[in-house]
Curated annotation (Swiss-Prot):
This is Protein FixC. The keyword Oxidoreductase applies. The keyword Membrane does not apply. Keywords: FAD, Flavoprotein, Nitrogen fixation, Oxidoreductase, Plasmid. InterPro entries: FAD/NAD-bd_sf, FixC-like. Its cofactor is FAD. Could be required for the formation of a functional nitrogenase Fe protein. Probably accepts electrons from FixA/FixB and reduces a quinone. One of its GO terms (molecular function) is oxidoreductase activity. The gene is fixC.
């Protein structure tokens, strides 16, 4: 058998596309979550880390194969490969979403989940009351919590960020 000698853990950054640091320099590349390559929208990270590591390795292999040095200019090949991959395309698609969620986190992580949960309960509740009353009460709870303008604003900002 084996015995565990050490445990390790770390926080996973979720800054998104706009938080990606410099990915390469003279003699170095950054991959995975160290490069902020996490897609918080789709809860992806491991696949992005593996793909970025693979691409960094391929870039380094190509540079070494032609006798090149690990200069910033040569290692820019890694950034180009990453830019053509699904990794950057997906992160770019949702580039504005992290800032929206961080700016208005209480509504997106507390208010809306609570309202949606209550609406779902109201929708399936069998209590003998006319559903029109339940639907009006549910709509009123959303308006009371966020106002009509707040709901419209959140919907538009979400749609723009989600594009």
């Amino acid at each position: 058998g084996s015995e565990i000698k050490e445990y390790a853990a770390h926080l996973i950054p979720e800054g998104g596309f706009k938080a990606i640091p410099q990915l390469f320099g003279n003699g170095w590349v950054v991959v995975g979550d160290a490069a902020q390559l996490n897609n918080a929208v789709h809860r992806e990270g491991s696949n992005l880390a593996m793909t970025s590591g693979l691409m960094a390795g391929e870039a380094i292999f190509q540079i070494k194969s032609r006798g090149g040095l690990m200069t910033k200019r040569n290692l820019s090949l890694y950034k180009g490969m990453l830019g053509k991959s699904f990794v950057m395309k997906d992160l770019m698609k949702h580039k504005d979403l992290p800032s929206l969620l961080h700016t208005d986190s209480h509504n997106f992580f507390m208010t809306y989940p609570t309202l949606i949960s209550q609406a779902a309960q109201n929708f399936v509740r069998v209590d003998g009351a006319p559903k029109i009353n339940t639907e009006k009460a549910t709509a009123a709870s959303f308006i009371n919590a966020r106002s009509r303008w707040g709901l419209i604003s959140d919907a538009v900002r979400s749609a723009v960020s989600w594009r």
